[in-house]
A protein has these predicted regions:
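Jelly-roll (double-stranded beta-helix
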Residues: 1-47, 52-73, 81-164
Length: 164
């Protein structure tokens, strides 16, 4: 409760145990406003403390929604693109494996009209609280990156609604 004010969009995360060698342990609160999909080489553990969330994933090239209800846990398999959608007053605990040197995370954006991969950014993640947000800002600042290159489509992804 003392740190709820730190859970700010677009991601809403706050690392709990900094300096831990093995795990990134975060509390993540809603609402968030995300259109990106995070791709992690390791598994991610979700424990939903308050409220229900939708974890959007890409499975076999197609979008799929997984509901994680309050009190439930979910282990996301490694290398599964995912986009947590958190409503207001939701709080969850998320654990990820700390990145080893050379490991790269990815942020992916898919066309909202045809599901084509619009852009994939690579990060050697050192500070999860700041680097995800910076990569998102770079993507949304570029109309070219947000424009679908499929000739029959050409849709332009609008940036997500900014939340306070």
């Amino acid at each position: 409760d003392d740190n709820r004010h730190l859970l700010k969009p677009p991601v809403g995360n706050q690392q709990v145990y900094k300096g831990n060698d093995d795990f990134i342990v975060m509390v993540v609160g809603g609402p968030n406003s995300r259109k990106d999909y995070h791709y992690d080489e390791g598994e991610e553990f979700f424990y939903q403390l308050e409220g229900d969330i939708i974890l959007k994933i890409i499975e076999d090239g197609k979008p799929k929604d997984i509901e994680i209800k309050e009190g439930e846990i979910f282990l996301l398999p490694a290398r599964t693109p995912h986009s947590p959608q958190r409503g207001a007053n939701t709080v969850g605990l998320v654990m990820e494996v700390n990145r080893r040197p050379g490991m790269q995370d990815r942020l992916q954006w898919y066309c909202e009209k045809c599901n084509n991969l619009l852009h994939e950014g690579f990060l050697e993640l050192k500070d999860i609280e700041t680097e995800l947000k910076a990569a998102m800002e770079t993507f949304y600042a570029s109309t070219d990156l947000r424009t679908c290159k499929v000739k029959e489509c050409g849709a332009v992804m609008e940036p997500p609604v900014k939340l306070a």
